[in-house]
UniProtKB/Swiss-Prot annotation:
Keywords: Lipid biosynthesis, Lipid metabolism, NADP, Oxidoreductase. Changing residue 347 to T: Increases protein stability and enzymatic activity. Catalyzes the formation of C18:0 fatty alcohol instead of C16:0. This is Fatty acyl-CoA reductase 8. It is an enzyme of class 1 (oxidoreductase). InterPro entries: FAR (IPR026055), FAR_C (IPR033640), Far_NAD-bd (IPR013120), NAD(P)-bd_dom_sf (IPR036291). Gene3D superfamilies: NAD(P)-binding Rossmann-like Domain (3.40.50.720). It comes from Arabidopsis thaliana. Coiled coil: none annotated. The gene is FAR8.
C-alpha cells in the first residue's frame, strides 16, 4: 500500500451496485465522510428510472440515521450540496445485460470515467427462488464483471461475497479462490453452472406451460434451488448461487484485477459512523429478538460452536483497504475472509449467557405494556433431539388445545393459534439456521490479517488514527453485545 486510503479515494470515480443495501450504505457513507473529494459515486439501485432511483436513495439511504454524523458535521445544506455534486443515482438491475441501464449516453459516460467497480448487490434469502438467485448472485456477478471490462480506466473489481461459500466443511477454511474444475460433490458429480441455468429455465418453462400460479411457481423454484444446492454440497440456495458467482468471476476476469471480500455474519457498526447502527434482522438477530420477546425459549445450537460475527464498519474498512492495495495490480485475484472466528472467537454458549444477562436487566415490553420475563435459553445440540423436544414439550400440548378449540371454539381458539404460530416460527428459524448454528469451520484470515497490519502502519504514518481499522481482536464481545449491538437492534430495528 503506497499511500493512505484517504489519498487513494481522492478524485476516484466509483461504481457501487446494490447501493440501498445495509453494507453498501455503510461503505458509501464512510467514503463521503472521510474523503469528500472523491470524484464521483455512481450508485446503482433497482428503480423504474433515474428519478425513481434518486428518490429511493434519498428515502432509503441519505435520510436514514446512518447519515446523521455527516448531517451534523456539514449541516443539511452542505450535505445536500455534497450529495448532488458527488452522487449519481443510476436505475439498473445487475440481473440484466448492461446492468439494466436504459440510458446509453449515461452508460458510455460511466464507462469512460469509472476507476473502481464495487459489487455489493445480492439476494440474501437463504431459500431464494432459484431463478432469482442465479440471476442476481451468479450471472448478475458476471454482468458486473462484463460491465467493468468495458470501463477503460477500470483498475479493479471488488466483489462482496460471503464466507459461507465454503458450504458445510469443518476445520480451517482456506482464504483462496475457487477453482471451478475442482468443484464436485462427495459422489464426484461435477458442477456445471451453465447446466444449472438450463435446468432452471426448463423447470420454469414447465411450470408456465402447466399454468402454475405465481405462488406455486415461487414454491417450486425455491424447492429447486434448495435441491440443487444440497445435491452439490451447499446448505442453501443463497450460498450456492454466491459460490457460483465467485467461480464465474474467477474464470472470466482476464486481466482485470479482482478482489473478493468474504464477510461472515455482518452485525451492527462497532464505531462508525456511530456504534450500533443496523438495518433489518440479520442472521442471529432474529434469534436475539425472538428470545427477548419471550417467543424463543429453546433453539438448535451446539454451545461450543463458534458464532462468527463481524461489525459492518469493519467490513467497509476492509473493502476500502483492499481496493487501495490492489487497484491497478496485474493479474490480481485476491480473497479476503473478514470475520472473527480465527483471531477472536465467541461461542454460542457465551452468547446465551450474555443474552440472558441483557434481557433480565433490560426487559422488553409486550403489546399490553407488561414486562417480558426471559429464562435462560435451552440449547439442544442435534436436530433429532430438538425435534423430539419440540414434540413432547410443545406440539402435543398444542394439539390438546386444538381439541379444546373444536369443542369450545370461543374459549381457547386464540391461545391455540398463538402457540401454533410460535412453534411454526421456531421451526422455520431452526431449519434456516441449522447449517450455521452447528457449523464446525473456522475461517482462515491470514490475508486479511496481513492487510490489516499494513493498514495500521499506513494509518500511523499518515496520522489517520486507525481510521480504517478492521482488526477483530479489538472487539470486546460482551461489551459490544450488551452496550452496542442489542441496543442498536432495539433502537433501529424495533424502533423502541
Amino acid at each position: 500500500m503506497e499511500f493512505s486510503c484517504v489519498h487513494f479515494l481522492q478524485n476516484k470515480t466509483i461504481l457501487v451496485t446494490g447501493a440501498t443495501g445495509f453494507l453498501a450504505k455503510v461503505f458509501v457513507e464512510k467514503i463521503l465522510r472521510v474523503q469528500p473529494n472523491v470524484n464521483k459515486l455512481y450508485l446503482v439501485v433497482r428503480a423504474s428510472d433515474n428519478e425513481a432511483a434518486t428518490k429511493r436513495l434519498r428515502t432509503e439511504a441519505f435520510e436514514k440515521d446512518l447519515f446523521k454524523v455527516l448531517r451534523d458535521n456539514l449541516g443539511d445544506e452542505k450535505l445536500n450540496t455534497l450529495l448532488s455534486e458527488k452522487v449519481v443515482p443510476v436505475a439498473g438491475d445487475i440481473a440484466m445485460d448492461h446492468l439494466g441501464m436504459k440510458d446509453s449516453n449515461l452508460r458510455e459516460r460511466m464507462q469512460k470515467e469509472i476507476d473502481i467497480v464495487v459489487n455489493v448487490a445480492a439476494t440474501t434469502n437463504f431459500d431464494e427462488r432459484y431463478d432469482i438467485g442465479l440471476g442476481i448472485n451468479t450471472f448478475g456477478a458476471l454482468n458486473v464483471l462484463n460491465f467493468a471490462k468495458k470501463c477503460v480506466k477500470a483498475q479493479l473489481l471488488l466483489h462482496v461475497s460471503t464466507a459461507y461459500v465454503c458450504g458445510e466443511k469443518p476445520g480451517l477454511l482456506p482464504e483462496k479462490p475457487f477453482v471451478m474444475e475442482e468443484i464436485c460433490n462427495e459422489n464426484g458429480l461435477q458442477l456445471d453452472i451453465n447446466l444449472e441455468r438450463e435446468l432452471m429455465k426448463q423447470r420454469l418453462k414447465e411450470l408456465n406451460e402447466q399454468g402454475c400460479s405465481e405462488e406455486g411457481t415461487t414454491f417450486y423454484m425455491k424447492e429447486l434451488g434448495m435441491e440443487r444446492a444440497k445435491l452439490h454440497g451447499w446448505p442453501n440456495t443463497y450460498v450456492f448461487t454466491k459460490s457460483m458467482g465467485e467461480m464465474l468471476l474467477g474464470n472470466h476476469k482476464e486481466n482485470l484485477p479482482l478482489v473478493i471480500i468474504r464477510p461472515t455474519m455482518i452485525t451492527s457498526t462497532l464505531f462508525e459512523p456511530f456504534p450500533g447502527w443496523i438495518e433489518g434482522l440479520r442472521t442471529v438477530d432474529s434469534v436475539i429478538i425472538a428470545y427477548g420477546k419471550g417467543v424463543l425459549k429453546c433453539f438448535l445450537v451446539d454451545v461450543n460452536s463458534v458464532c462468527d460475527m463481524i461489525p459492518a464498519d469493519m467490513v467497509a474498512n476492509a473493502m476500502i483497504a483492499a481496493a487501495a492495495t490492489h487497484a491497478g495490480g496485474s493479474k490480481v485475484h485476491m480473497v479476503y475472509q473478514v470475520g472473527s472466528s480465527h483471531q477472536n472467537p465467541i461461542i454460542y454458549g457465551e452468547i446465551r449467557e450474555i443474552l440472558f444477562c441483557y434481557f433480565t436487566k433490560n426487559s422488553l415490553r409486550s403489546r399490553n405494556g407488561s414486562m417480558i420475563t426471559v429464562s435462560k435459553m435451552k440449547l439442544i445440540p442435534t436436530l433429532a433431539l430438538f425435534s423430539l423436544y419440540m414434540t413432547i414439550r410443545y406440539k402435543l400440548p398444542v394439539q390438546l388445545l386444538k381439541l379444546v378449540d373444536i369443542i369450545y371454539p370461543s374459549r381457547e381458539g386464540d391461545e391455540y393459534k398463538n402457540k401454533n404460530r410460535k412453534i411454526d416460527m421456531v421451526m422455520r428459524l431452526v431449519k434456516l439456521y441449522e447449517p450455521y448454528v452447528l457449523f464446525k469451520g473456522i475461517f482462515d484470515d491470514r490475508n486479511t490479517k496481513n492487510l490489516c497490519a499494513k493498514q495500521k502502519e499506513e494509518d500511523n504514518r499518515n496520522s489517520e488514527n486507525f481510521m480504517f481499522d478492521f482488526d477483530p481482536k479489538i472487539i470486546k464481545w460482551k461489551d459490544y453485545l450488551i452496550n452496542v449491538h442489542i441496543p442498536g437492534l432495539i433502537t433501529h430495528v424495533l424502533k423502541k
